[in-house]
Each structure stands twice: as structure tokens, then as C-alpha cells.
Design a protein with these regions (language model features):
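N-terminal leader/linker segments that initiate helical-solenoid repeat arrays
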Residues: 23-62, 71-76, 145, 156, ...
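Short solvent-exposed coil/turn linkers within tandem alpha-helical repeat scaffolds
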Residues: 32-35, 64-74, 101-113, 133-146, ...
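Alpha-helical segment of the N-proximal tetratricopeptide repeat
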Residues: 39-63, 161-164, 168-169, 196-206, ...
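Residue at a conserved register position within TPR or TPR-like alpha-solenoid repeats
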Residues: 48, 85, 122, 165, ...
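Structural motif corresponding to the intra-repeat A-B loop/turn of tetratricopeptide repeats
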Residues: 51, 88, 125, 168, ...
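Single-residue signature of alpha-solenoid repeat helices
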Residues: 57, 94, 130-131, 174, ...
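Catalytic glycan-binding domains that act on GlcNAc-containing polysaccharides
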Residues: 300, 312-315, 337, 349-352, ...
Length: 711
């Protein structure tokens, strides 16, 4: 049996809270409402502010301040009153309010922001020479903030401000601004400033702009060696490999060029490798190994050498590189990649000795985790060598022990009647033992035996049978002994939940909840997350976490909480998600963005469950996710892929914004459809940022199996 990864294309608002200090367990107050009924309150003033009606907002905020209302969130009232005044260019009033906030609330989350904007308001009010401000006593971060903000507002001082930021701090955003608006003047700056601008522009992704500065510096013979390195890299990244090769050669020819020699050797070797000049590439890689034997790039190079040897069916040479990598860099991911490559090639060549050599190492590396992953390799290898008895042992072990439906489904394709009967008998025994311990109120032992039950028919048919229902019913009765679960199902009113939380956290949570009910979701999140991180987790805390985190679009943070939901009632759910109550299972595997996913998936004839699986594993449903490789948004689309999809007549989003949930989902589903329809499903990984394809696919397909059963 060849090992295949099947990606299923078609199957995928508080009255003012002033009495919280007297809350105690013996006397719980009733709070019938939890927002102010005053016609003018924080909510109405904030809406005016957010709608751009700053003068009206300022007047409302100052009325609240002078009336001593909203005491619990007074720092926020003052802050947005100051900000409204600032936007009206009432700088004196803004400064007075920012000063008031800093005086009254030195520990407020808003203090540093007030400090920044107060300095900015003073800058605009005083209108003194730019150099006076930058020569002042303000801290660097204040000067940078004021400078960058002033660049967006001033017209007669922007060049001077940008130069101050560049000369003093090499501020990246100021460099980009100056380059975009005063490029001719930039080319005439002192060479040391020009070089720093070039490197900052390069790191920020403005490669062509940086190239102009590097070329200018080379002509003036300033820091020529380093400039040569950067120009070589830019040409390489722009796929101008022949020109890059020449420039790398010039740079490396002078052994005194030390600053970027390490990177120069590596990238030059990589460049020649892409040019199919293997001899030159290998020579450069060998020089790198000699000069930098402990560098993190070494296992990458070993992997290249190993694959060259494997392509030539030279297991002896490949094994030497693998051994070096295992010995010197045992925990490096490239070592793992090399091991798997060696193992696959040995198996393909039917070399039993080397196959089992590689398998033994793989087993040692994963002896404590991912046992079913190792079992899958054993099944595959035993099958390839026609050792069917051993294969069947591993199949049965998978069916009896694995909690990953992805691997169980694979094992079921090879299972015979005797194996299935073995599982059924084992399930019957475990159920009887679980019932005995449950009758004795020994709940830990009950769960122990329930966890041993393998729901293979549920996995195969996606329908709960008698066994599953009975096991889940017993588990829920055990979970209901816990206060968290009991409170979850108690159907308490929101006032009751709020009062309980006030007892647990005193004043800490009330501010965030008040902000939430007034619609200030992001600030509610900022305040509440601090509490959640340090307070014992209870149901009222979880209740408001769900409301606040989701309404502030911090879905990823809530997913991180839900992924550990079992710890709130003492059950390591990862052992068996199926035993959890339905509501808890759907917290772990939620269907967010249903209104976007379902119709689009239906249009392209792709199962929505597959889309949710990708979003869950790629971004934890975080629409602002950004990977180290540049993949963006919910489905982690690469910009080039998204631009190509956006040319289709069905879309043409303008402007294209991959952090927009709708755009990301629509373009992602469209691209998946193309991959499947063009029979490129095996290349599906190309459009996603992944380091370990095999493990990634395992996670996505595991999620798919749960989604397809829970909805």
C-alpha cells in the first residue's frame, strides 16, 4: 500500500457601580440593570466620538466628568474627552484633560496613551521650532510618537520632522515617508544616513527603493562591500539570478568582507543551486560548513546534500549526512525532514535494513508523543514489505488506542472482522467497568475506562450509536458534579452571573464589563484579558470572556481558552473529545463566519467543514493573523495567490485586503476549488504557510473529522 494523504475536496448594555467594595458572600446585592439610564452617558458620548462628531462628544464627555458620573470608568471618560478635544484642535483643553487623567489614574491602562497625546497636543499648541522639541527632555518613544503623528498633519514642517526622526532614531516609518516624498533630497543625504535608510527600506520590503540607495553608495565607494551584498540579495529575490551570481562572486572574492560573509555564502550557494549549477553550489555549501560548522543553516545544508544523494540512490552518502545532522542538531526541524526523506527513499528502494534503521530513530524521537503517527509508519512499512501479520498488529493497536479519527479511519480501511470484534469486545468490557465504578461514585476510574472505549462506528458512519450515547451520558453526569459545568447549565440570569463575578474579582472585572455593555469592545477586551490571565477560572468569568472576546474580534484569544476548556472541570479532553457535552465540543470546534463560509462553499461544492478545519488550524479564526512567511488572515493566504484569485470576474475586490474576513474566505475557497478541480489537490499545501506538511495535514483532517460529526 502506498501511503497517501487524501484531502477531501467535496467532503470539507450598568447603572453606576459604586457599591462593589461591600460585596461579600453573605450579602449579594441585586443589580437590576448594569448600565446608566441617563440620556447622556459614556455610550452616547463614545458614539458621537466614533462618528466623528468630536465637539458634541467633547461636550458630553465634559458633562459626565463634571457631574462625577461613570466613576468606575472615569479614566476612559477623561481620555475620550481629551481625544475629542484634540481632534477639534482644542489643544489646551485636551492637554488639561490628559493631565487630569495622568494625575487621577496613574495606574490606568490609558496612562501611556495620555502621555503620548498630551505631548503631541503640546507640540501643536506651542508651534515651536521642531529642533526645540527633539532637543527636549521627552523620552525617545514620546518623541517618535509625536514625530510620526505630526508627519501626517503638518505640511510646512514634515520634511524637517522626518529628518529629525531619521538622524536621531533611524525611525523606519519616517524613512519610508521621506523616501516616498523626498527621494531626490534623500539621495543627497550624508552617506551614513543614506546607508541606514537603504537597509531599513530593504528590511521593510521596499527592495527597489533600497536598490537606488545601494547603487548610489557603491558609486561613491561607501561601505561598498555591504552594499554589494544587499544588491546581490535584491537581484536574487527579484529572480534575477545571473546578475545575483555575479554580485555574490564579487563580494565573496574579497575575504575581508566579513559583515555578511556567512549569509553571502549561504545565499550564493542557494542561488547557484536554483541555477542548476550544482558543482558551484556544493562548493560554496562546503565552504560554509567548514567556516560555520555550528550554524543553524548547517542542518538545512545537510538536508540538501542528503537529497542530492537520495536522488542518486546513494543511501551510504545520504546516511552520512543524516547521521551528522542527528548528532549535531538532533532537535532541528531540518533534521526531522532529512530523516523522513531518508526513510521514504529506503522504503521506495525496498531496502529493509535502512528502512527499519530510519524507523527506529523516528520511534525514538516520538516515543512519548504522537504514538499513532508512529503506528501509521509501521503499518505502511509492514505492508510494503508484505509482513501482513505485523501490519495487522499495528492496525489493531491503532484501533484500540488511537484517539485521532484521522488515523483510525486509515486503520479501518485495513481492518478485518476479527479486529473489529476485538474492539467491540474491548469496548463492552470497558463500558461494564465504567458502570461499576460510576455506581461506586469513583468518577476518576469511570472516566479512565470511558476513555478506553473506541467509537470506531461513530467515526466511520458519523452517527452516534447506543454505545456513544451511553458513554457520553455517564460522562456528562460526572462533569455535572463540577461547579463550572453545573453553572453552565443552570440558566442563571445575566444579573446573577454578573453578581457572582463581582464577588470573585471585586472591582477588577466591573470596569471591563461596563465598557462592554457600553459598546467599547476593544477597551473591554484590554481590561478583561488582564483579569482572565490571573484569576481562577470560573463560569461567570468564562461567560463574559466569550461575550467580550468575540465582540471585540479577539476570536483567537477565546479559542485559546476553549482549547483548554476541560481543565475547568478536571477533564483532559484531548484524550477523548467525543465524551464532552455537545456545547463544549462546539466551543473547541466552532463554526465562526458561517454567513460567509456556507454560501461560498456551496457555490464551489466544497464541504464547509473542510473550510472550518483550515481556518481553525491555520489561524484559530484570527482574521488579523500574519505568519513569518507573509501568509495573511483566516485562511493564511499568500498575497500573490490572493492577487491571482482576485482577478476572477466573481471577485475583483478593490482594495484587496486579506485581513478582511469576507475577502479572505471568498478568495481562499475559490483557490481551494481550483486546486481540486484541476486535480492539484496534492499541491494544496502550496497556498498555505506550513513547515511540516505531514503534521499539518494530520491536524486539518483531524479537525475535519470532528466538524463533520458535530454539525
Amino acid at each position: 500500500m502506498k501511503k497517501r494523504i487524501f484531502l477531501l475536496a467535496l467532503s470539507f448594555e450598568l447603572i453606576i457601580i459604586i457599591a462593589t467594595s461591600v460585596l461579600n458572600a453573605k450579602s449579594m446585592p441585586e443589580i437590576p440593570d448594569i448600565i446608566s439610564k441617563n440620556k447622556i452617558n459614556y455610550k452616547t458620548a463614545l458614539k458621537l466620538h466614533n462618528d466623528g462628531k468630536y465637539l458634541d462628544a467633547y461636550n458630553q464627555f465634559t458633562n459626565i466628568i463634571n457631574g462625577n458620573d461613570e466613576a468606575l470608568i472615569r479614566d476612559y471618560v477623561i481620555y475620550y474627552g481629551a481625544k475629542s478635544a484634540f481632534y477639534c484642535e482644542m489643544f489646551k483643553e485636551a492637554i488639561d484633560l490628559y493631565s487630569l487623567l495622568m494625575k487621577e489614574h496613574p495606574r490606568s491602562y490609558l496612562y501611556p496613551y495620555a502621555e503620548q497625546y498630551k505631548a503631541l497636543a503640546e507640540f501643536y499648541r506651542d508651534d515651536y521650532p521642531v529642533s526645540n522639541f527633539f532637543n527636549g527632555k521627552a523620552q525617545k518613544w514620546i518623541k517618535e510618537f509625536v514625530g510620526l503623528k505630526a508627519l501626517q498633519k503638518t505640511n510646512n514642517k514634515n520634511k524637517e520632522i522626518a529628518l529629525e526622526l531619521i538622524n536621531r532614531f533611524y525611525t523606519k516609518d519616517a524613512i519610508i515617508y521621506f523616501n516616498n516624498n523626498f527621494q531626490k533630497e534623500a539621495l543627497n543625504l550624508p552617506n551614513n544616513i543614506k546607508y541606514k535608510m537603504a537597509t531599513e527600506l530593504y528590511e521593510a520590503g521596499f527592495r527597489n527603493s533600497s536598490l537606488n540607495y545601494f547603487n548610489s553608495l557603491i558609486k561613491q565607494n561607501y561601505n561598498k562591500a555591504n552594499c554589494l551584498y544587499y544588491t546581490a540579495r535584491i537581484n536574487q529575490q527579484e529572480n534575477k539570478r545571473e546578475e545575483a551570481a555575479k554580485l555574490f562572486d564579487i563580494y565573496l572574492a574579497n575575504t575581508n568582507n566579513k559583515s555578511y560573509r556567512r549569509l553571502g555564502l549561504y545565499y550564493s550557494a542557494d542561488n547557484y543551486y536554483k541555477l542548476k549549477n550544482t558543482k558551484k553550489s556544493i562548493s560554496l555549501y562546503q565552504t560554509f560548513l567548514k567556516e560555520y560548522p555550528k550554524d543553524d543553516y548547517v542542518p538545512r545544508i545537510y538536508n540538501i546534500f542528503l537529497n542530492e544523494s537520495l536522488n542518486a540512490n546513494n543511501l551510504i552518502s545520504a546516511k552520512r549526512y543524516l547521521t551528522n545532522s542527528l548528532k549535531k542538531f538532533p532537535n532541528n526541524r531540518w533534521t526531522e525532514t532529512s530523516l523522513k526523506s531518508y526513510l521514504r527513499k529506503s522504503l521506495r528502494l525496498k531496502n529493509k535494513t535502512e528502512t527499519y534503521y530510519g524507523l527506529k530513530i523516528l520511534e525514538e524521537r516520538h516515543s512519548k508523543l504522537r504514538n499513532d503517527f508512529i503506528l501509521s509508519w509501521n503499518i505502511w512499512i509492514a505492508n510494503e514489505f508484505k509482513d501482513f501479520n505485523k501490519r495487522d498488529e499495528y492496525v489493531l493497536e491503532t484501533l484500540l488506542t488511537s484517539k485521532n479519527p484521522y488515523y483510525i479511519k486509515g486503520a479501518l480501511t485495513l481492518a478485518n472482522k476479527d479486529m473489529l470484534q476485538n474492539v467491540y469486545s474491548n469496548n463492552a468490557y470497558n463500558m461494564e467497568e465504567a458502570k461499576k465504578f460510576f455506581a461506586d461514585s469513583n468518577y476518576s476510574k469511570t472516566l479512565e475506562f470511558l476513555n478506553k472505549i473506541q467509537f470506531i462506528d461513530y467515526i466511520a458512519t458519523k452517527r452516534e450509536d447506543k454505545l456513544v450515547k451511553e458513554a457520553r451520558d455517564i460522562a456528562k453526569k460526572i462533569f455535572m458534579q463540577n461547579k463550572f459545568v453545573k453553572d453552565f447549565y443552570s440558566k442563571k440570569t445575566e444579573n446573577e452571573i454578573f453578581n457572582e463575578l463581582s464577588l470573585q474579582t471585586r472591582k477588577e472585572s466591573n470596569k471591563s464589563i461596563l465598557l462592554y455593555y457600553y459598546g467599547d469592545n476593544q477597551n473591554a477586551y484590554n481590561e478583561f484579558d488582564k483579569i482572565y490571565s490571573k484569576t481562577q477560572t470560573t463560569y461567570p468569568l468564562f461567560y463574559y470572556a466569550q461575550k467580550i472576546f468575540l465582540n471585540s474580534a479577539n476570536t483567537k484569544r477565546f479559542m485559546q481558552i476553549c482549547n483548554n476548556i476541560g481543565k475547568y472541570f478536571g477533564y483532559p479532553y484531548s484524550q477523548n473529545v467525543d465524551l464532552l457535552p455537545e456545547e463544549f465540543r462546539k466551543y473547541i470546534y466552532p463554526r465562526y463566519f458561517d454567513d460567509l463560509v456556507v454560501p461560498e462553499a456551496k457555490y464551489y461544492k466544497i464541504e464547509p467543514e473542510f473550510i472550518y478545519s483550515i481556518m481553525r488550524e491555520e489561524s484559530l479564526f484570527d482574521s488579523k493573523a500574519l505568519s513569518w512567511a507573509g501568509a495573511r488572515g483566516l485562511m493564511q493566504l499568500m498575497p500573490a495567490t490572493a492577487r491571482a484569485e482576485n482577478k476572477k470576474t466573481r471577485y475583483k475586490f478593490n482594495p484587496l485586503n486579506l485581513y478582511d474576513s469576507k475577502q479572505n474566505i471568498y478568495l481562499g475557497i475559490s483557490h481551494l476549488s481550483w486546486l481540486f478541480q484541476s486535480e492539484n489537490a496534492s499541491n494544496y499545501i502550496i497556498f498555505i504557510d506550513i513547515e511540516e506538511t505531514e503534521y499539518y495535514v494530520e491536524k486539518v483532517m483531524k479537525s475535519y473529522e470532528y466538524y463533520s460529526r458535530y454539525y
